């Protein structure tokens, strides 16, 4: 489907406004952890991820907030649904290590 220049400008503007809201909400989560947890419960984990616990029988799969808009993804399943939609500016700076049976196998072999 082809869009006119005006329609594309509106889509870009909407994406930027949504990204600004994401940054404001992420700052609230970082500055006020308790309120961040409440807002996470209110908006659901699909919108505001915290560290996701995984079963020790599966490979590691962790999502954790870092800074204001930087998140970390590691493992077989990256949990893409937990990231805000249309936000391509996420930086992967940090890593979180989850101890699993697969890790034990790597250590002892």
Swiss-Prot record:
Main location per the UniProt record: mitochondrion
GO cellular component, one term: mitochondrion
Superkingdom per UniProt: Eukaryota
UniProt keywords, alphabetically: Mitochondrion
Subcellular location: Mitochondrion
Keyword Mitochondrion: yes
Other observations noted: A stretch of 270 kb of the mitochondrial genome is duplicated within the centromere of chromosome 2 resulting in the duplication of the gene. The expression of this duplicated gene (At2g07685) is not demonstrated.
Protein name: Uncharacterized mitochondrial protein AtMg00760
């Amino acid at each position: 489907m082809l869009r006119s220049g005006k329609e594309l400008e509106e889509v870009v503007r909407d994406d930027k406004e949504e990204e600004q809201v994401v940054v404001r909400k992420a700052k609230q989560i970082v500055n006020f952890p308790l309120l961040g947890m409440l807002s996470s419960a209110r908006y659901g984990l699909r919108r505001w991820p915290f560290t996701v616990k995984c079963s020790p029988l599966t490979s590691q799969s962790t999502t954790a907030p870092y800074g204001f808009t930087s998140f970390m993804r590691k493992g077989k399943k990256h949990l893409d649904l937990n990231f805000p939609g249309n936000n391509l500016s996420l930086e992967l700076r940090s890593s979180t290590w989850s101890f699993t049976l697969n890790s034990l196998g790597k250590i002892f072999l």
